Amino acid sequence: MAKSEEARAPKRPMWTGSIAIGLVNVPVKLHTMVFDKGIHFRFLHKDDGQPLRYEKVCTKDNKVVPWESVVKGYETGKDRFVVFEKTELDAAKPESNQTIRLQMFVDYLSIDPIYLDRPYLLTPNKSDDAYSLLSTTLKKMGKAGIGRVTIRDKEYPVLIYPYKNALVLTTLRYPHEIADPGQLEELKDIKEPSSEELALAKKIVTDLSGEFDITDYRDSYQEKLTALIEKKIKGEPIVAEKPVQPEAKELMVALQETLKQLKKK
């Protein structure tokens, strides 16, 4: 039951609009680019092993509410709401609901990775002339465009850059969505390492330095989970083995022994 690791084709577009650069208009379609290939379990009723379903139940009369009777509301107080129709919510949609206006261009590597959220694939819509021009220009100059887009009732800052023969849009996180490490007590007043510790740590990093290749990495948890499922299907017993914890060592000793192990390779 192993799942194929072949690359998947993008699904149908989830957004259609255009990229605007001054008076230049680039018609595009936005596709999901990241897929969850993990194993998923369903919740079952323990007594009979049948799957559970979830329903929208009114908290007042405990009756199941059909989807056509569901509206959105904003809570103004305990059990007090103002109700919005879809047409009313549409009034709040900004220009970025249909147009990604690029406001500036930056070096792609100048963006702190902490702000990178989710990548989407941009494809040309109807005409590809302007799309090709933008993609080629960004690729030759090593630049990325900064703009905004509204997806599913939220406006995101975005980064648009070339990837292979396409353009990719990555949504960015707002500063207030990122935790401030300085607020954690554990990170306050951390002492500086000794010069000896730092020297050994630098040697370890140097010895382990190399070129990153994502294909070198596999999801070992999913592979083991697949093997367990196959055992379960065959009715074979499953025994959980506890991982062996490495012996705790004093920092300098651990650094020195790590260097020795690396030299043996």
Model-derived features with residue positions:
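Boundary segments of small protein-protein interaction reader/adaptor domains
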Residues: M1-K265
